[in-house]
Amino acid sequence: MSAGPLAGIRIVELGGIGPAPFCGMLLADLGAEVIRVDRPAETGKDSPHPVILRGRSSVAVNLKDTEGAALVRELIGRSDAVIEGFRPGVAERLGLGPDVLLAANPKLVYGRMTGWGQDGPLAQEPGHDINYIAVAGALHTMGPADGDPVPPLNLVGDFGGGGMLLALGLVSALLHARTSGVGQVVDAAMTDGTALLLAMTYGFLAKGGWQDRRGVNMLDGGAPFYAVYRCADDRHVAVGAIEPQFYAALLRVLDLVDDERFARQHDRANWALMKDELARLFATRTRDEWARAFDGQGACVSPVLSLNEAPEHPHNSARSTYRRGPHGGPEPSPAPRFTTTPPGEPAPAPCVGADTTEVLTTLAGLAPDDIDTLREKGIVG
């Protein structure tokens, strides 16, 4: 895209899955030119991730070949930033580490995305989102009081504490590079990012307002006024009536204003009884019946929508929170919104290697015959 607040910024993304390409998507959505380096063996294949890989170019280059690595160094030398998601030490072995690249391009911002970080006892260990949020302390907080921890998809480690944090770090370092002329390395670890997302929880813990066990606290489903309830049709509503005025509205709609069990909202000794009664009441109507009953009542009660339902909700539809992707299904629209520099529509995720010739011709200065020779050698795709 040419529009957006990051228009004019060029970023090279070194392959990868999950948080690193999510970071690339965020920056591409906001107008940055993102060039993704893929493996030549995948050349011509449809994008494996049609949403998260939208909005960028794809060049297919063999990073394990010295000529291929040299080509990528040339691209990065003409770029503002790089996104790298390998295990610590891999980029260095490929000749694509920050020392080499910053020596050639001192203003470069080098973003590193890992689970454990570049150092520490676990730095070389494999892992996934569930492992990172487990060690960071977040997974322990999620799930019922009488059950096991429940992983929140890979939203917390990979995306909230990973790719999104790296995007913030890259933009911050790019701003510094613009004003100082000095680049730097951004070490984004999913364990660090997940810990950061727990800032308010640790604040509650420090003040004695949080028990270090799940399902018994105000924000983890322990409170009857901040929980999910099953309805008559086996669908659910989410109740978030924390503040007194919202709690009062909840009781009013449910005809519980005069029920003594609900007179003291924060009496934890009574929470179990309150929760049982709310569960009984919500089970008497369907989800959509409750949604209509609470519409406009200011009680902070919402229907729990499925992935297919959410794009069709009137609010999401009015704000174009979701868009119809080129793959034919819904996908999230770029966010946040900008008044002066609104981004354009994201381009479809390219086939692997779709832009190899154009990028290498334009940025690396190669002639078409040179590129054909590299293809014959398997160095590019």
Region roles according to the model:
Residues D295-P346:
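A glycine-rich dinucleotide-binding beta-alpha-beta segment and adjacent secondary-structure elements
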Residues S2, G325-T373:
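Flexible, small-/acidic-enriched active-site or ligand-binding loops
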Residues A3-E42:
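Conserved small-residue-rich beta-alpha loop and adjacent elements
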Residues F225-Q297, V301:
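Aromatic-enriched alpha-helical interface/lid elements that frame and gate functional surfaces
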Residues V12, I52-A104:
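A structured beta-alpha segment of the ubiquitous adenosine-cofactor-binding alpha/beta core
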Residues G16, L63, R87-P88, T114-G115, ...:
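Short glycine-/small-residue-rich Rossmann-like dinucleotide-binding loops
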Residues S2, L26, L30, E92-V237, ...:
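Active-site-adjacent "lid/gating" segments in soluble enzymes
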